[in-house]
From Swiss-Prot:
General function of this protein: Aerial growth, conidiation, and dispersal of filamentous fungi in the environment rely upon a capability of their secreting small amphipathic proteins called hydrophobins (HPBs) with low sequence identity. Class I can self-assemble into an outermost layer of rodlet bundles on aerial cell surfaces, conferring cellular hydrophobicity that supports fungal growth, development and dispersal; whereas Class II form highly ordered films at water-air interfaces through intermolecular interactions but contribute nothing to the rodlet structure.
Secreted keyword on record: yes
Gene Ontology cellular-component annotations: extracellular region; fungal-type cell wall
InterPro entries registered for this protein in UniProt: Hydrophobin
Family, per entry: Belongs to the fungal hydrophobin family.
This protein's name: Class I hydrophobin dewC
Keyword Signal found: yes
Source organism per UniProt: Emericella nidulans (strain FGSC A4 / ATCC 38163 / CBS 112.46 / NRRL 194 / M139) (Aspergillus nidulans)
Top-level taxonomic group: Eukaryota
Induction behaviour: Expressed after 12 to 24 hours post induction of asexual development, which correlates with the development of metulae and phialides. Not expressed in hyphae and strongly induced during development.
Key words, A-Z: Conidiation, Disulfide bond, Secreted, Signal, Sporulation
Cystine residue pairs: C43-C119, C50-C113, C51-C90, C120-C156
Record text on subunit structure and interactions: Self-assembles to form functional amyloid fibrils called rodlets. Self-assembly into fibrillar rodlets occurs spontaneously at hydrophobic:hydrophilic interfaces and the rodlets further associate laterally to form amphipathic monolayers.
Amino acid sequence: MQFTIASLIATAVLGLQMASAAPHAPGSSNAAIISQAQEQNTCGNAHLSCCESTDNSVSLTQEEEEGLLHLLGGTSSVLSDGLLGKYSGCSSLASVEGILGAGGNQGLVSGQCNNHVACCDAGDNELVGFLEPGVAVLKPNSDGIQNGLANVAVPCVPVQVL
């Protein structure tokens, strides 16, 4: 069971690392326009948010270090790269006036958020227990849907805006 969960998380981490390493097209910049549909494709049920700061100095107990996070490389890779960092001061970009137009027609212009862009939990999930220290199990959302084999309670996950 631990190997299955570890391999799923490792695949997700690898996907995020590959996406962030993707080269830009000639003449492109970080001034892309993100539509509401792209936000939905990027974040799913979470909200695209702008966070003021992140704290990557997350420390693990000895028990946590020997668990699932240790299988993923411990604090030397997963946590130090900011993939599970603690974000603070996050506000939904959809709630900032003028960024998302009515019906999503206007789009989100990169540069409106000069800090950290992340997909943050929509808040409709409920923590029901722990698989092991540091890995939480979530109750299905209000629609009774639980996506994935094991859902992990991570409030915000960074997004690479191209």
